[in-house]
Amino acid sequence: MTKHAGTVERLRGLAWPTMLAGGLLLVLLAQVQWGSTDEGVEPSITGLGRVTILGASDDDVEFFFEDNTGRPGLSVVVLGAVIAVVAALGWWRPRLRPSAIGLIGLASVIVLVVGIRTLSDPAAHLFSDRVSEALDADLPDMQAGYGLIGTVVVAILLLVVVGFWVLSSVWPRAGAADRVEINRTDESS
């Protein structure tokens, strides 16, 4: 085994715990700030729809915003848990790895789409239309929170790990086949 092949195998071994950690990180990032604004009462909202307003009691905020948030982070929590469980299964059982890597890749793409879609207009995806009707004004301009940005970054990193695992499982086999062909030619001479 060459030095390069040994390094690739060690990195492939780290892919599964990395994907497990990425799935758990997605679950955590959905529960922190996805958007905030400096306008009006300066609300801050998590991916799961929990709104925080400085100086307001939690009961008042919950009464007004209870059913008026979009909760895009809910799908991220579910998909993050799926990624973590499937990565643990792939790490534990090598025969499950091809299907596990496909499922992790698909879930990561969906998380990335949810994250980018929410990142494009946080207020529109975090609050429902009823909030603007109740405020009798347009939704405030919101800045993306660290949870939303982190979700997009983790989804991209998961896709990079999936791509590396797939490519590294295909390329060494092609190299091994070439070496076998060379050896056959050498032996027959």
Predicted features and spans:
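Intrinsically disordered terminal tails
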Residues: 1-16, 163-189
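Hydrophobic alpha-helical transmembrane segments
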Residues: 70-92, 152-159
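Hydrophobic alpha-helical transmembrane segments of polytopic
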Residues: 15-22, 79-83, 100-110, 147, ...
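Juxtamembrane transmembrane-helix termini
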Residues: 32-39, 93, 117-124, 164-178
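Hydrophobic alpha-helical transmembrane segments of integral membrane proteins
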Residues: 94-132, 183-189
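N-terminal signal-anchor transmembrane alpha helix
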Residues: 10-36
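Long, glycine/tryptophan/cysteine-rich extracytoplasmic
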Residues: 28-73, 122-144
